[in-house]
């Protein structure tokens, strides 16, 4: 009998330890929209404070960004707890748009980091396949949650908006790189994929099975609109879902939402951020 009670006590102790060691995390993806005067009243100087207040109010712990120039990222870093990893897509340093990962530096430590381009030669800045506009980049890092000691990977991407072949090949390259770098570890993968779920590039990801669409496994009903692109218009159809958060199989998604925040009729970006609350 003593052995039985000792066994039960050990099981309970392990359960309690597992719960205490659980990492709860708020993850998001947010296309910030590049800073251009062509946006007029929607240009970055007129909305950067809205972006910062949204991030603070929804308590993002870590989030992938797209389109941000260095000065836009620096504006967000005025929130003292944040830092970022990621390089400019034009020169691998600071020039051009970034696919930066912004993270709470008081909570997470960067263990590894890297970048690759969506191109035939992923190691150097350049356009890939049938892309004609821009270099496209993926930035990634391995993080350690300092309180629990748990580690995880985070990948953040921005696919081409014109080249159909480029988007398809980008999905193949993303999966190839993630399998090589991540292995069986916990991960989050965010981005503006410029592709809807039924399209070829996304079907490559779904059929592979490594990346789990957080919306499809959320324990609670998804919040917000189906679409994530709004064109700075409150009356836009908001049907095009092109921004995603994928997770590894060991991640529990407590809730998923597309955040349709606006202030006085203005929207912080031409994309809505997508957010999940998750645990692992």
List each model region and its residues.
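Active-site neighborhood of phospho(di)ester-bond hydrolases with catalytic His/Asp-centered motifs
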Residues: 63-66, 87, 188-192, 213-216
């Amino acid at each position: 009998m003593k052995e039985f009670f000792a066994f039960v006590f050990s099981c309970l102790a392990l359960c309690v330890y597992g719960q205490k060691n659980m990492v709860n995390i708020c993850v998001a993806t947010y296309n910030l929209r590049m800073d251009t005067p062509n946006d007029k009243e929607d240009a970055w100087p007129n909305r950067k404070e809205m972006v910062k207040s949204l991030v603070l109010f929804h308590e993002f712990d870590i989030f992938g960004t797209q389109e941000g120039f260095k000065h836009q990222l620096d504006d967000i870093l005025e929130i003292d707890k944040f830092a970022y990893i990621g390089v400019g897509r034009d020169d691998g340093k600071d020039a051009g748009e970034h696919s930066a990962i912004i993270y709470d530096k008081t909570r997470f430590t960067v263990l590894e980091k890297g970048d690759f381009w969506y191109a035939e030669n992923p190691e150097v800045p350049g356009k890939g396949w049938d892309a004609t506009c821009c270099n496209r980049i993926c930035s990634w890092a391995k993080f350690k949650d300092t309180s629990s000691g748990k580690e995880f990977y985070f990948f953040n991407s921005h696919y081409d908006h014109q080249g159909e072949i480029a988007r398809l090949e980008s999905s193949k390259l993303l999966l190839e790189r993630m399998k090589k770098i991540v292995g069986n570890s916990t991960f989050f993968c965010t981005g503006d994929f410029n592709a809807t779920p039924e399209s070829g590039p996304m079907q490559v990801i779904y059929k592979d099975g490594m990346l789990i669409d957080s919306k499809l496994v959320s324990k609670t009903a998804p919040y917000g609109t189906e679409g994530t692109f709004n064109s700075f218009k409150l009356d836009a159809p908001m049907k095009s879902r092109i921004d995603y958060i994928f997770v590894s199989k060991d991640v529990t998604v407590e809730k998923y939402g597309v955040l349709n925040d606006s202030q006085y009729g203005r929207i912080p970006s031409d994309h809505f951020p997508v957010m999940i609350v998750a645990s692992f």
